[in-house]
């Protein structure tokens, strides 16, 4: 009596087809990389790193209300849309986890895993890497900002303009000092 309903539920949980947006998430020590690879926002790419000041971490400043979840670039998605997450890792095993969305997906070097979620409320939602990944593991937050369709379209346009302004001129000749700064 339970086998058929349970099987249908598990199959639906793993069904990543018909997604509105597909985002590749790459775990790095100790940050996340996001590449919007299909749907509105295709071509957007950025890193997400912790911005909590070291003084708070070292107890030299009072802790903020977003202690250890402040990030420089939130992942942005529209409310009510099916978001497919394709996860992998660059170095060690990580796990992209947002409890509010019921998502915990391991990111494993050399493997591509996928899952999906649909955020039903506008707001900012936080998570953490939930796989011990090294000495800075505790400093690897995740922030997802869920916005209206109109706000998402505005964010996409603004982000693409920002990326275009930061893109290099392909004919530019770099000095040695410029190359050193870039790594």
What are these regions, as identified by a protein language model?
Residues 1-183:
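Non-transmembrane, membrane-proximal soluble domains of secreted or membrane proteins
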């Amino acid at each position: 009596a339970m086998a058929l309903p349970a099987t249908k539920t598990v199959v639906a949980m793993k069904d990543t087809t018909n997604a509105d947006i597909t985002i590749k998430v790459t775990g790095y020590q100790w940050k996340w990389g996001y590449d919007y690879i299909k749907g509105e926002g295709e071509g957007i790419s950025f890193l997400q790193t912790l911005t909590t000041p070291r003084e708070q971490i070292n107890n030299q400043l009072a802790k903020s209300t977003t202690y250890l979840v402040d990030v420089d670039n939130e992942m942005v998605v529209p409310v009510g849309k099916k978001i497919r997450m394709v996860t992998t890792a660059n170095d060690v095993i990580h796990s992209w986890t947002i409890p509010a969305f019921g998502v915990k997906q391991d990111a494993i070097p050399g493997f591509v895993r996928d899952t999906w979620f649909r955020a039903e409320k506008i707001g900012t939602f936080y998570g953490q890497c939930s796989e011990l990944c090294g000495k800075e593991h505790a400093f690897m937050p995740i922030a997802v900002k869920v916005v209206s369709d109109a706000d998402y379209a505005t964010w996409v346009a603004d982000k693409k303009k920002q990326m275009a302004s930061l893109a290099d001129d392909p004919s530019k000749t770099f000095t040695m000092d410029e190359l050193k700064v870039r790594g």
